[in-house]
From Swiss-Prot:
Domain of life of the native organism: Bacteria
Subunit composition and interactions: Homotetramer; dimer of active dimers.
Protein's name in the database: L-alanine/L-glutamate racemase
Gene Ontology cellular component terms for the protein in this record: cytoplasm
GO terms classed as biological process: peptidoglycan biosynthetic process; regulation of cell shape; transsulfuration
Reactions this protein catalyses: L-alanine = D-alanine; L-glutamate = D-glutamate; L,L-cystathionine + H2O = L-homocysteine + pyruvate + NH4(+)
UniProt entry keywords in alphabetical sequence: Cell shape, Isomerase, Lyase, Peptidoglycan synthesis, Pyridoxal phosphate
Chain positions found as N6-(pyridoxal phosphate)lysine: K202
GO molecular function (one): glutamate racemase activity
Pathway assignment: Cell wall biogenesis; peptidoglycan biosynthesis
UniProt key word Lyase: yes
Gene3D superfamilies: Aspartate Aminotransferase, domain 1 (3.90.1150.10), Type I PLP-dependent aspartate aminotransferase-like (Major domain) (3.40.640.10)
Amino acid sequence: MNTDDILFSYGEEDIPLKALSFPIFETTNFYFDSFDEMSKALRNGDYEFVYKRGSNPTTRLVEKKLAALEECEDARLVASGMSAISLSILHFLSSGDHVVCVDEAYSWAKKFFNYLSKKFDIEVSYVPPDAERIVEAITKKTKLIYLESPTSMRMKVIDIRKVTEAAGELKIKTVIDNTWASPIFQKPKLLGVDVVVHSATKYISGHGDVMAGVIAGDVEDMKNIFVDEYKNIGPVLSPIEAWLILRGLRTLELRMKKHYENALVVSDFLMDHPKVLEVNYPMNPRSPQYELASSQMSGGSGLMSFRLKTDSAEKVKEFVESLRVFRMAVSWGSHENLVVPRVAYGDCPKKDVNLIRIHVGLGDPEKLVEDLDQALKKI
């Protein structure tokens, strides 16, 4: 099935009342016409429409599309990206287990691992985003490897297949956060990953007005996560938000191509600027990671980072406050142009004082270059 079919028509063959736009089924309950119909639905509660905390027609349509985009058998929408991360982690770990996690993973993912370590005696090894180092960290107690590639602050790329081949031989589960590349540009399932998670808050919804997460994988894993973690913890996504994600999916491929086009222009400018020490954007052909990145991804997103040639926090502050088009804000993945200086966080190590992350949006890239240029002249 090609991407156009998935985004525009898959699962929408029988829309009620011949509507061209799939409806929002904003209801808590679903009724039954007979005892047998009700009994069948209650016995097959995973996919039947019974109660909002389970499945919903609007939500289920979007889940089918997301599973198809990721080349997975099934997917589940949840209330946030962190919900997707925590549910998938909880499912594969038990007290006394060991997990390997890339040390540049999303900070709240690491905080969750630290919480599990203290509360449930789970051992966590944080290792650099390098396949060989990850494989070397495996022990006899390892049950899960948690990946992020590219990582979301320094955009480091991992040889995913090298990790999954080693994990598969040892029957270790792998989970990856695929938010940076989106399912348009990277399909980790085809590289051997067991479960793929996303913050759908970002590119998948794409308009900066939805918070959601995605978990995708094999039917068996998805069914078990749904029954064991999802139904017990209850991170339910509203059908209205699922419908907004559906709206965002219509333009996902177009938006990702534009983000990539703009990011190449901006990263080229930064790579050539005398006040910039380093640019982290793996899908630029000039990047030292391009060969590996392009073997796993067909394009890049709008997220990158760079280092200024300074170790002064004041200079970094002056730079970001001089920007006019880029706005200081966390998160990323919609049309906006955003900037986050690493030093704004209280836990910033000295070596990262000059590290700045930007998200390149959907506008004219030359305006972004002009904005960066005028701000760089101020320092």
